[in-house]
Amino acid sequence: MSSEQVDENTSGGIHGLYRWTMDALFGSRVSPSRKYREFAQDDTNYKSRDELFKGSYKDGNSRGRSNSWSGLDPNFYRRHDLLPLEESQSSSKSSLMDPVDLHPRAPASPVLDTTDTFGAKKGSWRRSESTIEFKSPSADDPVVSRLFEKRKPRHKENVITQRLAPQIPGKFPSPVKGPSSDYTSEYLEILNQLDRNGRALQEVNRGLWERCEQRQRQEKSYRDSYRETRAELINELKQSRKLYDNYYKLYGKYQQLKAISKETLDLQSKVNNLESELVDTAIKKEKQIHDLHKQLFQAELRAQEAESRRQRDAIAYESRIADLQRQLENRYRPSSPVSYRDQSTLSDYNASVDTQFLKNLV
């Protein structure tokens, strides 16, 4: 057997070149049938897996014989590198909940083979690191839960019947198949609901766009109003500043006028006092003037009386003189003219009368 492997894998010639070319183009894939033949011969046939099972026997674990129920265990296929049966895979209850392989032709985990010469050029056959892997919907997804809401109790009953099924040695039952159900109406209902939801989302989206446009218009109007209000506020602030400046100027003038008015009040009081004093003085002067006028009037009256008396005396004196002259003329009529020098020699001449007359004239 070992010589055959050497001949197939490492020997030269056309067969080795063909094998190397096939491995380089399509990858070295070992057929699972050969491994299955190795494990299916006998329980004691270990061959190249001696070291693998020695540790398990050291730990006290015994290897069980495969039976008809081993095909239902997924670990059986994983342990022996076997492909699962399509029937069992399609009959599993949770197959629709499992992840969907977007690259069914590519291996689940790419194996880096040193003999794969053209492995870098087969990127379309293998999964790349940038490929978005599909994630299965969760159990609480509304669509999945609605689709399988009628299937859950049946699934539980089937699980209970599977758990309670007796394991009879040597029996080869057929894989359990659930009753086929037609979910076309439910799919159509879900699709209609999705269509309605899509239209509702379009309406919501349209409403959101309208609200967004309305909000933009409102923001624009608010912005314009804000700018107008800001300009008005700036003008009002400028006017207020001018008003306050003028107010402070007027207040300063008011303070000055108040001080001046205070001084004016003091001066007015002084003027009033002076006016009162002046009035009193004027009254006194008027009284004095009145007294002086009265005295002057009395003096004038006395002067007039004296003048009238003097005039009367003068008239009396003149009449007296005239009488005396007539008397003298009548008494003495000389043959020759008589001078006044000779009158002093008259015996009846009174000099005191003339003296008194002269004083009255002065």
From Swiss-Prot:
Keywords: Coiled coil, Cytoplasm, Cytoskeleton. Residues 50-71, 87-123 are annotated as: Disordered. One of its GO terms (cellular component) is cytoplasm. InterPro entries: Bbp1_C, Bbp1_N. It is found in: Cytoplasm, Cytoskeleton, Microtubule organizing center, Spindle pole body. It comes from the Eukaryota. Residues 223-331 form a coiled coil. The keyword Metal-binding does not apply. Residues 87-96 have a biased composition (Low complexity). Disulfide bonds: none annotated. The keyword Transmembrane does not apply. It holds the Pfam family BBP1_N. Residues 50-62 have a biased composition (Basic and acidic residues). Component of the spindle pole body (SPB) required for insertion of the nascent SPB into the nuclear envelope and for the proper execution of spindle pole body (SPB) duplication. Connects the central plaque of the SPB with the half-bridge. Required for proper localization of CDC5 at the SPB and for proper M-phase progression. Belongs to the BBP1 family. Homodimer. This is Spindle pole component BBP1. It comes from Zygosaccharomyces rouxii (strain ATCC 2623 / CBS 732 / NBRC 1130 / NCYC 568 / NRRL Y-229). The lineage of its organism: Eukaryota, Fungi, Dikarya, Ascomycota, Saccharomycotina. The gene is BBP1.
